[in-house]
Amino acid sequence: MRYITGAVALGAALVLGTLATTAQAAAPAQPARTGGLYAPTELVLTVGQGESRATATVQRAVTLSCMPGARGSHPNPLGACTQLRAVAGDFNAITAATSDRLCTKEWNPLVVTADGVWQGKRVSYSYTFANRCEMNIDSDTVFNF
């Protein structure tokens, strides 16, 4: 009788083990996590009063995301993303723009910064303008907030 009970228990264990293995094999596999279709573009832009990034007091900060669509707390995300795409994300090209407008020669420095990721590449940029007038001329849309 002991042998029969042991054989039945062993048989039941084998059947249940086989069913559990089969059930696990039949379960659908979880899809592999893949990245998005677009390289990430997420930026934090700031404007601060001061002569350098290290000493400036941040007055305003906004977020800007350009992929897959323009969005963020920037007042004109579409315009800012369009301006950045036109220069392939080169912030120097934006801040070095020229204009026919004239500004006073006062020294009241403003520092603009951009930190984050532009089309998958890390960005850490800062530029010091002599005054607000020069900043508004040169930075057209991206730092105009």
UniProtKB/Swiss-Prot annotation:
Propeptide: 26-35
GO CC entries: extracellular region
Entries under SUPFAM superfamilies matching the protein: Subtilisin inhibitor
Source taxon at top rank: Bacteria
InterPro entries noted in UniProt: Prot_inh_I16_SSI, Prot_inh_SSI_I16_CS, Subtilisin_inhibitor, Subtilisin_inhibitor-like_sf
Keywords (A to Z) from UniProt: Disulfide bond, Protease inhibitor, Secreted, Serine protease inhibitor, Signal
Quaternary structure note: Homodimer.
Name of the protein in question: Kexstatin-1
